[in-house]
Amino acid sequence: LNDDPEKEVSFSSSLLTPSEEIYNETRKRENYLLDVDNEVVIPINKKIRFLITSQDVIHAWWVPDFAVKKDAIPGFVHESWAIVEEPGIYRGQCAELCGKQHGFMPIVVRAVEQAEYEEWLVGKQEEAKAVFETVGKEWTQEELMVKGEEVYTRVCSVCHQANGQGLPPAFPSLVGTGLA
């Protein structure tokens, strides 16, 4: 987001929509399939440089309000930029048919005043430091179960369902396998 290496932030985000909404077990919220757990935050009235790549297949980073659609290709880094003048939430999505999860790849950018951005940045740096400090930690079974449930709910339940029974044959049941 800037030229100061001390202020660099790297993170990923995942779809926030719970599997219960996807499988019509509960009512869908207003931004169904459009919310993420970790939105990109940028300051307004500054030129923001986006570096775009992929770890797996070709994707496309598309945010219509920024007039940006750039391919994300493994092994390549593409760049784009935008100047956002109004605070607000800007939504986009993957615009390249990239596989079975294509419909579950929203992009959320929150544009804020500079002071709010600085607060967000400090918070992200503190989160990164806290994660780094857990590298050698001895985790209790209870702590590991809590972390595992968070990951399963966020990542796995979309295919394997909240109850672990999956959608055979494409997504096998995890019940009784020792994996869940």
Task: Go through each PLM region and give its residues.
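Non-transmembrane, membrane-proximal soluble domains of secreted or membrane proteins
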Residues: 1-147
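Sequence/structural segment immediately N-terminal to covalent heme-attachment motifs in c-type
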Residues: 141-167, 175-180
